[in-house]
Design a protein with these regions (language model features):
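N-terminal export signals
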Residues: 2, 8, 12-18, 23-45
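C-terminal segment of N-terminal export signals and the immediately downstream linker at the start
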Residues: 38-74, 150
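Metal- or metallocofactor-binding catalytic centers and their adjacent structured scaffolds
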Residues: 88-208
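Conserved, mostly hydrophobic/aromatic
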Residues: 92, 197, 210, 323, ...
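Glycine-rich, aromatic-flanked loop segments that form ligand/cofactor-binding clefts
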Residues: 192, 198-236
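Metal-dependent enolase-superfamily TIM-barrel catalytic cores that perform enediolate-based chemistry
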Residues: 224-341
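C-terminal extensions of enzymes
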Residues: 438-476
Length: 476
């Protein structure tokens, strides 16, 4: 027996594969993305077969803001004021992103001058979105959609506690320190400040090696070059508006449609409970588009627990794909209860602002899939950390996507790079996202896919003449 044991042991050791640390890190999509997050400059250089020292000078020389005229441009985010931020290196490479959605551009410029200028992209990227942020779920009242609320975007006291360091099996060292996370659509600093800078830095890094950002994040392992798109509705005025809108999306070639319900009222007639009107929309759309068409429902935290359970049971019955933000994110116990009583997954997370919060909600089964808003979680870097945390726990990660082409492109690079992202949200109609100074537009192909960009960085080359026409002022 002893000899047999020794023989088996020797054979086992002889046949065991000899994995290096590099093989382990780069052997899977999640591992390659994690390695890219630990050392973005190394990942970028390796994507073109050079050393980090061979990259051009990526020291930040200047930050500025283009203030554009939004008079004739449709705004999906009502707070969008049209600012385009710019970060420029000594080698002349420019990174861009929008911060006009947050309406805090002047403060960002002062912060960016002090934080970025004179420092290298290669030094900033691993740590910029790993600084201390704010902890605590948030939310807003839905009174404008027919439900009473306190009138505030975020409840008093939220976002005041110190953030706990992020803890997740996908990261180590500086990358695990947690994203600096805050609020969306006019939230507090530092999250959206950092997010705008982080995206610009990734845009620069991609341009420095002539590669799209997602290629750097994929690490040569995940070769996805397209993502299935679904049409995401606006909050429409009346119940009668939804069926034509969904049928139009189907006619355009989309394979799915997400309902953002409005007040839940008919154009004429007596007022009814909002959630009852939403249930009518849910039934009528399923009847109109057929059983094979994919449908989702996102009331944006509009319901109480009873309403959410009533709506959720109908969604289950009619085979909807997911139920998004059914109740306020702060109601963690309510989310757990709904998850236990409903079959379809609940997409939750747009109003979480730290990786510690995501870890808690995942641990407690308070969500069935992870949603995130990149501006809330530190840009591309913070979003990748949250997405890989989700993947490590076997959960889908679905980035929120609502705004202009810059917002959309960040979400698209994330979906191309994350191993557990499957559907790409496209505001309907998509023309509302277009900006006249950006050459590339988001449009689905005949099979409802959005194809990956081929231009370097974010993949949004600027038409300088068109930008000049709409620029009212350049802030420096």
């Amino acid at each position: 027996m002893k000899d047999q044991h020794n023989v088996r042991g020797k054979a086992s050791r002889k046949s065991a594969p000899n994995f290096s640390r590099r093989d382990f890190l780069y052997g899977s999509a999640a591992g390659a993305a994690s390695a890219a997050m630990l050392n973005p400059a190394m990942a970028a250089a390796q994507s073109v077969g050079v050393k980090p020292g061979d990259l051009p000078d990526l020291t930040i020389k200047e930050v500025k803001v283009y203030v554009t005229d939004m008079t004739n441009i449709h705004r999906l985010n009502g707070t969008e004021t049209g600012e385009l931020v710019s970060v420029v290196t000594h080698s002349g490479i420019e990174g861009n992103y929008t911060i006009g959605n947050r309406n805090h551009t002047t403060g960002w410029l002062d912060w960016a001058k002090a934080t970025l200028v004179g420092k290298s992209v290669t030094d900033l990227l691993p740590t910029l979105a790993s600084t201390s942020g704010m902890k605590g779920p948030g939310g807003f009242d839905a009174s404008s959609f027919g439900r009473p609320g306190a009138g505030g975007r975020t409840p008093p006291g939220f976002g005041t506690e110190p953030q706990r360091p992020g803890e997740g099996p996908a990261f180590g060292g500086a990358a695990v320190a947690g994203s600096a996370l805050q609020t969306h659509g006019g939230g507090l600093w530092p999250n959206y400040y950092i997010a705008a800078a982080d995206v610009c830095l990734w845009d620069i890094l991609g341009k420095a090696v002539n590669r799209p950002i997602y290629k750097i994040l994929q690490g040569g392992v995940n070769n996805r070059d397209r993502v299935m798109a679904y049409a995401s509705s606006n909050h429409l005025p009346a119940i009668e508006d939804y069926v034509p809108d969904a049928l139009k999306a189907k006619e355009l070639g989309y394979k799915g449609y997400k309902i953002h319900p409005g007040r839940g009222q008919h154009r004429t007639g007596p007022e009814i409970p909002t959630y009852v009107g939403h249930m009518e929309i849910i039934r009528e759309i399923r009847k109109a588009v057929g059983d094979e068409f994919v449908l989702m429902h996102d009331p944006v935290q509009m319901y109480n627990r009873f309403e959410a359970l009533s709506v959720g049971r109908l969604l289950d019955e009619l085979d909807y794909l997911w139920f998004e933000d059914p109740i306020r994110t702060i109601d963690e116990e309510g989310l757990i209860e709904l998850g236990q009583k409903l079959h379809l997954p609940m997409h939750v997370g747009e109003f979480l602002y730290s990786i510690a919060d995501y870890a808690e909600y995942i641990k407690r089964d308070a969500l069935g899939a992870v949603r995130l808003i990149s501006d809330n979680v530190g840009g591309i870097s913070g979003s990748m950390r949250v997405g890989l945390l989700a993947d490590a726990h076997g959960l889908e990660c679905a980035p929120h996507n609502w705004g202009n082409e810059y917002d959309m492109m960040v979400a698209f690079h994330l979906e191309l790079a994350l191993p557990s992202a499957y559907w790409f949200e496209v505001p309907h109609p998509v023309e509302y996202t277009d900006r006249p100074y950006l050459k590339n537009k988001f449009r689905i192909d005949k099979d409802s896919y959005i194809l990956a960009p081929t231009d370097p960085g974010l993949g949004l080359p600027i038409d300088r003449a068109a930008l000049d026409k709409v620029t009212k002022q350049i802030l420096r």
